């Protein structure tokens, strides 16, 4: 009978995954700080990324060093934002957001991933029209009743409130511009989201199965594992990929 991975092997895998997450967040901090300054109180984009870093258990020292490097107080690599679009097998639309210090390397890695899995890269705007950019705040029913969260969200300027009874979850939808304000106003009422992000949501999902689902899942996994890739969005139905 075969033996499973050792405790040390599992720990190493966990540390490696954590390291990749930290690397990506540090790049995001740098870009946000360079674009809007190193003061999170006057830079909503930086504030969002810092919240994400703290939620991932990144230390304040690491966050502060990343900000200082970005604004020139410490030496560091400069990254730029790049977005690629394309199609996975089955006509699944994919958006890939990257932070890179070498565009040629990044586009080569992303193109190789698409080709390897039977997809293809497209021109700018080829799939983005199928998505909307939204702020999403996720709350558990346990922290407050549906009516209270809904009323607070509307008063704070949210666009919509979605209730998922089966998942015991309430989603508050905002515009990207109103995201930080809505989050902070609801937090002032004691309503803290367990997850908050600005993301792309597809207008409609595509269902895939069989070998197509396997290839789509493989492509998304490869893209997400690339060091330069920050976020991957698609319009594939996640249930068909076994990701819900």
UniProtKB/Swiss-Prot annotation:
The lineage of its organism: Bacteria, Pseudomonadati, Pseudomonadota, Gammaproteobacteria, Lysobacterales. One of its GO terms (cellular component) is cytosol. GO terms for biological process: regulation of DNA-templated transcription. GO terms for molecular function: DNA binding. This is Probable transcriptional regulatory protein Xfasm12_1059. Keywords: Cytoplasm, DNA-binding, Transcription, Transcription regulation. Pfam families: TACO1_YebC_N (PF20772), Transcrip_reg (PF01709). NCBIfam families: PRK00110.1 (NF001030), PRK12378.1 (NF009044), YebC/PmpR family DNA-binding transcriptional regulator (TIGR01033). The keyword Cytoplasm applies. Disulfide bonds: none annotated. It is found in: Cytoplasm. HAMAP family: Transcrip_reg_TACO1. Signal peptide: none annotated. Belongs to the TACO1 family.
């Amino acid at each position: 009978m075969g033996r499973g991975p050792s405790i040390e092997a599992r720990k190493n895998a966990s540390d490696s995954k954590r390291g990749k997450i930290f690397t990506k967040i540090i790049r995001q901090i740098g870009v946000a700080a360079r674009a809007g300054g190193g003061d999170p109180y006057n830079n909503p984009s930086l504030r969002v990324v810092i919240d994400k870093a703290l939620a991932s258990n990144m230390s304040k020292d690491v966050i502060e060093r990343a900000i200082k490097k970005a604004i020139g107080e410490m030496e560091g690599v400069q990254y730029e934002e790049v977005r690629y679009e394309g199609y996975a097998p089955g006509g699944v639309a994919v958006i890939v957001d990257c932070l890179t210090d070498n565009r040629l390397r990044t586009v080569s890695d992303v193109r190789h991933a698409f080709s390897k899995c039977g997809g293809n890269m497209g021109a700018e705007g080829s799939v983005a029209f199928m998505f909307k950019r939204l702020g999403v705040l996720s709350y558990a029913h346990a922290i407050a009743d549906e009516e209270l969260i809904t009323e607070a969200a509307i008063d704070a300027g949210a666009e919509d409130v979605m209730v998922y009874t089966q998942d015991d979850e309430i989603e508050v939808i905002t515009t990207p511009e109103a995201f930080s304000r809505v989050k902070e106003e609801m937090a002032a009422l004691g309503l803290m989201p367990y997850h908050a992000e600005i993301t792309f949501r597809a207008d409609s999902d595509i269902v895939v199965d069989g070998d197509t689902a396997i290839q789509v899942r493989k492509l998304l996994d490869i893209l997400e594992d690339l060091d330069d890739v920050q976020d991957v969005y698609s319009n594939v139905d996640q249930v068909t990929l076994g990701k819900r």
